[in-house]
Amino acid sequence: MHRYFQIAAALFLATSFALAPAIAYDTELSDTAVREAYFLGQRNDDKTRAFFVPYTKHLSVPKKGPYISEIRLLTPLAQVIQISSQTTSGYSAQQARLDYQQRGDSLLLVVHIEFTPTYGQIEAAQASGDASKARGITLRPDDFWQSFRYGIKQKADWIDPKVIRGEAEYGGADSFGRGGLVGAWVYVEYDAHNVISNDVDVSVFTPSGEEIQTSFDLTKLR
């Protein structure tokens, strides 16, 4: 009988470890976890930046087309730290907790698109008899990022996003106070409970159909 219980206990532990990767990473954050994340964000120093290293991928400049320069995958904890680091004036730990409760447990995919010499603010240009009038020139719209597709998958299964939003990015203003469009930041939000703590493949598809890929190991993220 004693031998039976030893075997049963061993099987239970083996099963538990086998299921471990499917258990969500840090969700349902405690007040203490949110508070510690808040203070790490408020530091906004080398320690804060070091935290985000495994959450960020920097990609190479393509030979042509738009430049997907940066991809981030932020867990609920990482989002608390990021928001705190961006709101250092008049932002309290209590507000960080309220913001987290309102936001819920989400996984945030962040994509930075930058223009290049072959994919810029001018979308198309047609021949014109009077070049000085610049006829036939079409400027890329502020919401150009909507012509891209974004997604994450695990074991070939795509995960449905909750929300997709984007923000146009502008360059320095000229003498008339106008700044040109230079890119965009795109934010894709997922329910963290739909993403297991395992490898995640990220894909960004350009308007021309090119796929830019990277991956993250959620077992190494908090």
Predicted regions and their residues:
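Bacterial N-terminal signal peptides that target proteins for export
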Residues: 1-9
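Bacterial N-terminal signal peptides
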Residues: 8-18
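Conserved functional micro-motifs across diverse proteins
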Residues: 23-222
